[in-house]
């Protein structure tokens, strides 16, 4: 937490508490999954803990966090300072309304359940969370190999950087000289205007218009030029920063660590391509896998290689390891992305709102990853999740995830391709 | 008008402390209506009368370079910013009175700017830590400005002002505390305006009248050393 708030002070203690609580409960959920696999604790007590955990998390996600978000947004707008609570409640009710409406177009409502049951809430939270997860993983799946592999790095020499810096400084000098002219003109007008600036009736005004019209026209022209030059200087600055960053990456890739990451990048890219491929197949052939990868993998090995395996024993351990890895990497990836995002957009005014938004996103993300993890676990462990979460249409969620994942991956490929193409063209034009 | 001589002053500080508003106030005597984030560097020009009111009065342009960014940026951004630190004649350090972190970051800002511009005689040997002696020997005039004074409630004002007084002493610099949305603080004749004018005079003097400045500088140092001995 300290890392997130290193440069900006988030004064409100409440915000910090809420964030930590959300995070803590989400992690507890994952711990419960692991306990499930390992067989720790009594079965009924596990069930109880699951229920308790879910209730608390849903309470926080659906009731408390949105309310506080509304409260802080309203307190940022100076106009509505008086009736903060009232407006916060209004915002919260709007949120609940939209939240409810969200459920309508999806086939998740079954007539058996009442209005305020856990299943309803989870289904909606699940939809939002799954969408988010799919977007993030789609983008991550494409961005990861792009960042890691040095194949994509453009070649940047010191001369390029120096040339660009020189252009930047020249632009700044031009801006300065123009601003000097404006300042001098203003000063002389001010000094002259002191004498003339008593509009003695109609004629005085006409005289002041004709004497200064030449000066002011010139000034507005210069001002426009200055604005254009400032825009140019901003662009040049961003390009220079980009070049410096690329140069740093090139140097980093020459070290051992860089080479190691490069190697990983190749692996990752194969994995990502495979995932995209699987998603396409799932959608095209309209099939949702019944058995999890681990058991299938072991079955295939046993059948093809004819090795005598104690399937149950090994499947338990392997699935435990796999699930553990998935959990850890997804938590780590999420936190890193959140930290970067937070640095990029935070300011001292809105840091409270942003922290709460992040807590909300994180909570939804974790709830839905529990939903989806069910897919990767062997049959006997699935039962408890199915029990706890009630009768949700799990298949729907998996399909929805695949669709959004595919869409997000394809659009991020397109986006990165365009960005990559644009940059070398800009440098050619220099 | 004849070509006026040029002087470069950097305006440094964390994101959102009010550097752009401050620069606008200093140069146009008007409050900035719609402050937005500064990307890269924005420059503005202030016409300053050196030694106003004396027969030696001469007009100079002072360029205020307002560099945006945060002190914890990646090395690539820092090296990009470093291109603006060439040949500077003075530094204005801006911090937010309501945000303690921004005052603490001023040390790192000043080190970043001063390490870049190393004069052949006054080499700053540093490993990034702050050392008061360096600022005593520092030949580039500094000024510390605290903004958002209006947002501090009356009860806390004294405590905040003592803290900033210590800060300014550490930098061996003058300090001004004001609110960038109110031009009253820099009205002609107020003590703030006098301090500002003195600072700009010091910058110009160091740039153009080195001998005169040097003798004054050495005299003040000798005075301070004598004080410390007692």
Curated annotation (Swiss-Prot), chain B:
* Highest taxon of source: Eukaryota
Gene Ontology cellular component annotations, sorted alphabetically = endomembrane system
PROSITE patterns named in the record? RAB
The Gene Ontology biological process terms listed for this entry are:
B cell differentiation; intracellular protein transport; natural killer cell differentiation; regulation of protein lipidation; regulation of Ras protein signal transduction; T cell differentiation in thymus
- State the SUPFAM superfamilies in the record: P-loop containing nucleoside triphosphate hydrolases
Which one Pfam family would you cite for this protein?
Answer: Roc
Q: List ligand-binding residues for GTP.
A: 16-21, 148-150, 179-180
What are the alphabetically sorted keywords of the record?
Answer: GTP-binding, Nucleotide-binding
Q: How does it assemble?
A: Homodimer.
Physiological role: Required for KRAS signaling regulation and modulation of cell proliferation. Regulator of KRAS prenylation, and probably prenylation of other small GTPases. Required for lymphocyte development and function. Not required for myeloid cell development.
Which named protein is this? Rab-like protein 3
Q: Which gene encodes it?
A: RABL3
């Amino acid at each position: 937490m300290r890392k997130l708030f290193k440069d900006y002070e988030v004064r409100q203690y409440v915000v910090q508490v809420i964030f930590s609580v959300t995070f803590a409960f989400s992690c507890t959920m994952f711990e419960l999954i692991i306990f499930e696999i390992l067989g720790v604790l009594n079965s009924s007590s596990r069930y109880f803990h699951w229920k308790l955990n879910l209730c608390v998390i849903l309470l926080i996600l659906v009731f408390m966090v949105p309310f506080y978000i509304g409260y802080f947004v309203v307190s940022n707008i100076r106009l509505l300072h008086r009736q903060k609570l009232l407006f916060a409640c209004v915002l919260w009710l709007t949120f609940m309304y939209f939240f409810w409406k969200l459920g309508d177009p999806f086939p998740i409502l079954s007539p058996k359940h009442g209005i305020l049951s856990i299943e309803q809430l989870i289904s909606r939270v699940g939809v939002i969370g799954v969408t988010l997860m799919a977007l993030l993983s789609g983008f991550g799946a494409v961005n990861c190999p792009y960042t890691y592999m040095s194949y994509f790095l453009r070649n940047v020499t010191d001369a390029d950087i120096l040339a660009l810096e020189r252009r930047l400084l020249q632009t700044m000098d031009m801006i300065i000289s123009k601003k000097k002219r404006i300042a001098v003109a203003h000063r002389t007008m001010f000094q002259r205007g002191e004498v003339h600036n008593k509009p003695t009736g109609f004629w005085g005004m006409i005289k002041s218009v004709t004497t200064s019209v030449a000066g002011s026209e010139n000034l507005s022209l210069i001002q426009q030029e200055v604005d254009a030059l400032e825009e140019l200087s901003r662009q040049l600055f961003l390009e220079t920063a980009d070049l410096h960053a690329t140069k740093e990456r090139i140097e980093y890739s020459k070290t051992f660590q860089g080479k190691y990451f490069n190697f990983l990048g190749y692996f990752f890219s194969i994995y990502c391509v495979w995932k995209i491929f699987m998603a396409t197949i799932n959608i095209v052939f309209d099939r949702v896998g019944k058995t999890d990868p681990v058991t299938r993998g072991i079955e295939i090995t046993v059948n093809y290689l004819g090795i005598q395996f104690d399937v149950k024993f090994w499947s338990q351990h392997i699935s435990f390891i796999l699930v553990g890895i998935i959990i850890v990497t997804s938590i780590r990836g999420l936190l890193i992305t959140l930290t970067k995002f937070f640095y990029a957009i935070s300011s001292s005014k809105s840091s409270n709102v942003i922290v709460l938004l992040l807590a909300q996103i994180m909570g939804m993300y974790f709830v839905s990853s529990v939903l989806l993890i069910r897919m990767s676990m062997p049959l006997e462990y699935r039962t408890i999740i199915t029990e706890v979460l009630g009768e949700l249409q799990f298949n729907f969620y998996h399909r929805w995830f695949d669709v959004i994942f595919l869409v997000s991956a394809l659009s991020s490929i397109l986006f990165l391709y365009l960005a990559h193409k644009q940059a070398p063209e800009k440098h050619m034009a220099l | 008008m004849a070509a006026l001589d040029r002087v470069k002053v950097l305006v440094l500080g964390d994101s959102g402390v009010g550097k752009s508003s401050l620069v606008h106030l200093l140069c146009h005597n008007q409050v900035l209506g719609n402050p937005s984030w500064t990307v890269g560097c924005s420059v503005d020009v202030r016409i300053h009368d050196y030694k106003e009111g004396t027969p030696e009065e001469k007009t100079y342009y002072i360029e205020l370079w307002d560099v945006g960014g945060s002190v914890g940026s990646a090395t690539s951004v820092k090296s990009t910013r470093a291109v603006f630190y060439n040949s500077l004649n003075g530094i204005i350090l801006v911090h937010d009175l309501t945000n303690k972190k921004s005052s603490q970051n001023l040390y790192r800002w000043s080190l970043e700017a001063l390490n870049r511009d190393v004069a052949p005689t006054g080499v700053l040997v540093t490993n990034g830590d702050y050392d008061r002696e360096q600022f005593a020997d520092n030949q580039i005039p500094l000024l510390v400005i605290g903004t958002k004074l209006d947002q501090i409630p009356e009860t806390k004002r004294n405590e905040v002002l003592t803290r900033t007084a210590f800060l300014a002493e550490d930098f061996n610099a003058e300090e001004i505390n004001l609110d960038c949305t109110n031009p009253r603080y820099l009205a002609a004749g107020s003590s703030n305006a006098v301090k500002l004018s003195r600072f700009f005079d010091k910058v110009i003097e160091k740039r153009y009248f080195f001998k005169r400045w040097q003798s004054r500088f050495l005299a003040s140092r000798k005075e301070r050393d004598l004080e410390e001995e007692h």
